[in-house]
């Protein structure tokens, strides 16, 4: 789980029967986990015989939380991918080869254009996912599945292509692209891989 280190943060536990319980943060032991994404803290929660308060017996509450989380993850991936695109464009207009900026070469232009063309429609997609939950539309869960899966794929493409535009520099700490590359990779798996959420989407349709 993402690390909510504040002592005031409560922990919610879902039972197999769908019931949700709230546990005081002081009753939970947190163990930090190492992941590929160093920009986010993740921890394992453990508790035994901890006092808990029943919050809900509605199993749908948990799924609605997961769906909302997927929409948020998609928006986070969108932001990371946009940053990588911006960095690729800026680098292509600064880096020179053969006495010309590499952004003037057709191959590099195409790489940047392909990233932009795939990423731009995702803005409206992510916006609608948020709107669907704001308005509690019937297609909100389905939209969350699709936007999570789609942004995972587009984000991976942008991360890979942006790194290629930078050449060998893209893999160095000096540029820092690898932080966002790993962020996108981490988001891809969190709350369900594209394959898993698309399978869920077929069951929702």
Residue ranges and their predicted role:
Residues 1-15:
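Single conserved hydrophobic/aromatic residue that forms the stacking wall/gate
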Residues 2, 41, 145:
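Exposed loop/turn and edge beta-strand positions of beta-sandwich/beta-sheet ligand-binding modules
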Residues 5, 24-54:
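Flexible, small-/acidic-enriched active-site or ligand-binding loops
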Residues 11, 36, 95-98:
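Short coil/turn linkers that connect adjacent helices within long alpha-helical scaffolds
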Residues 17, 27, 49-51, 77, ...:
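A broadly conserved detector of short glycine/acidic/proline-rich loop/turn motifs that flank catalytic sites
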Residues 18-22:
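Hydrophobic beta-strand positions in blades of beta-propellers and related beta-sheet-rich domains
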Residues 50-60, 99:
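Acidic-glycine-rich active-site phosphate/pyrophosphate-binding loop
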Residues 65-205:
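Alpha-helical interface subdomain recognition
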């Amino acid at each position: 789980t993402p690390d909510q280190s504040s002592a005031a943060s409560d922990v919610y536990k879902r039972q197999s029967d769908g019931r949700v319980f709230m546990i005081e943060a002081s009753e939970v032991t947190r163990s930090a986990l190492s992941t590929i994404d160093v920009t986010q803290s993740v921890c394992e929660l453990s508790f035994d015989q901890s006092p808990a308060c029943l919050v809900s017996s509605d199993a749908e509450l948990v799924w609605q939380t997961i769906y909302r989380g997927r929409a948020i993850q998609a928006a986070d991936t969108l932001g990371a991918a946009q940053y990588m695109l911006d960095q690729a464009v800026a680098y292509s207009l600064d880096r020179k080869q053969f006495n010309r900026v590499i952004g003037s070469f057709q191959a590099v232009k195409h790489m940047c254009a392909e990233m932009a063309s795939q990423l731009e429609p995702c803005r409206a997609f992510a916006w609608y996912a948020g709107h669907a939950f704001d308005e509690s539309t019937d297609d909100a869960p389905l939209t969350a599945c699709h936007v999570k899966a789609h942004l995972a794929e587009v984000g991976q493409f942008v991360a890979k292509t942006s790194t290629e535009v930078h050449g060998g520099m893209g893999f160095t700490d000096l540029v820092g692209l690898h932080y966002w590359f790993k962020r996108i990779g981490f988001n891809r798996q969190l709350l369900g891989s594209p394959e898993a959420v698309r399978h869920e989407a077929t069951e929702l349709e």
